[in-house]
Amino acid sequence: MLVVLLVALLVTRLVASLFRLALKELRHPLQGVVPSVSRVPLLGAAWQMRSFQPDNLHDKFAEYVKRFGRSFMGTVLGHVVMVTAEPRHIDALLQGQHQLKKGTMYFALRGWLGDGLLLSRGKEWHTMRKIITPTFHFSILEQFVEVFDRQSSILVERLRTLSYGNEVVNIYPLVGLAALDIITETAMGVNVDAQGADSEVVHAVKDLTNILATRFMRPHLLFPHLFRLCWPSGFRKQQAGVICLHEFTNGIIEQRRRLLAREANQDKPTKPHALLDTLLRATVDGQPLTDKQIRDEVNTFIFEGHDTTTSAVSFCLYLLSRHEAVQQKLFEELRMHYGQDLFRGVILSDFATLPYLSCVVKESLRLYPPIPAVARCLEKDLVIDEGYIPVGTNVVVLLWQLLRDEAIFTDPLVFQPERHLGEEAPRLSPYSYIPFSAGPRNCIGQKFALLEMKTMVTKVIRHYQLLPMGADVEPSIKIVLRSKSGVNVGLRPRLY
């Protein structure tokens, strides 16, 4: 009898909880303000999400935008997510100082990135942002371009054996190794030689990004206990990758700490030339940063600056391979500037006199943004149109759809670098072209990323003609934009 009563009590409480969730969903302030994709009470959009895969996510959201408009909402068990590609709503969300908390799904990254700049909030975020910002000062970026140039030269040499014009080359993994060498050297002052060796660190980074991409697509895997229960092999591999990278980072931190201690005894200590040096010299309230704080920031920098640059550079080279006239125009600009000396290095001041290169990069980022969506979790109510989005709601910004909106860009699917020189550029609203997000919590390293991207593209185009070979890209969103079919080109040495 007691068991029956306990079961009845549990069932009653469950029904009551479900009723409250259903009522919360029906009374949500967004109901009637933006369309809802949810058709089944409580279950909400979960039924539609069963078909979501990295390879079709961009098409699914494009379909929803077409059916429901630029902004819509979905629910799962009473939890509401608003999705938007509407510039007015994006402006309201990103521009203020009150909506700085990252979306809930980002916290799957905490095991690797800890409380680094991507995931921190409040005073901690403001403090670290202030400490890290000087790392991207002009004088330090100038030193970083030397690293970009040297590692890009190694990439160019590695491509030489593939440049006979009759072989399809998936450029993505090759660019990825160069980007990893660049990010580790600029972040930590060490070279992992990813382009020349089969590194354990390289494998760990690849494993973690692949696992995290899968978790982002499956909401139940965002919860640590369910992740461990439902995907034990993925959980174990993620743990192994995190341990590998944390041990690597901890070792480098100790090495750099000893180096800086020796330099402190010299008359003229060297200037900081890596993010790690800046962090080791920094203090908060008179106290140095802890090893964990430093490790979290370095790992965040590597995570944010590796795959994103790989994606950006690879898709840019792909577009150039498919648009011969654009590639030739860019090559002519580079030849006019650098002449026929293929060994002349790239320096920061070069980019001020290469306007078409800038347009090519901007247009490539518009068509293939490395991060196709960003998210915020509201810290206070946000007023939009005739209603408001309540505190605690996750809002997803569809950069992919925004940057391909025909109401904003003429012929949005056409690769047209000239649009960034012509009449179209000045009439864009501030929140229409935001491949690096926008507002106070935009990408802190966007200048770094653009310079790295320009350097790598410059080096490759000066050495090789890119040919339209291999399968076309099939976009796949795994946190960062990738391609299911590879990012394929052909290569032929330039004739001067």
Curated annotation (Swiss-Prot):
It is a peripheral membrane protein. Its cofactor is heme. Pfam families: p450 (PF00067). It is found in: Endoplasmic reticulum membrane; Microsome membrane. GO terms for molecular function: heme binding; iron ion binding; monooxygenase activity; oxidoreductase activity, acting on paired donors, with incorporation or reduction of molecular oxygen. One of its GO terms (cellular component) is endoplasmic reticulum membrane. Heme binds at C443. Its EC number is 1.14.-.-. Keywords: Endoplasmic reticulum, Heme, Iron, Membrane, Metal-binding, Microsome, Monooxygenase, Oxidoreductase. It comes from the Eukaryota. May be involved in the metabolism of insect hormones and in the breakdown of synthetic insecticides. Belongs to the cytochrome P450 family. This is Cytochrome P450 4ae1. It comes from Drosophila melanogaster. The gene is Cyp4ae1.
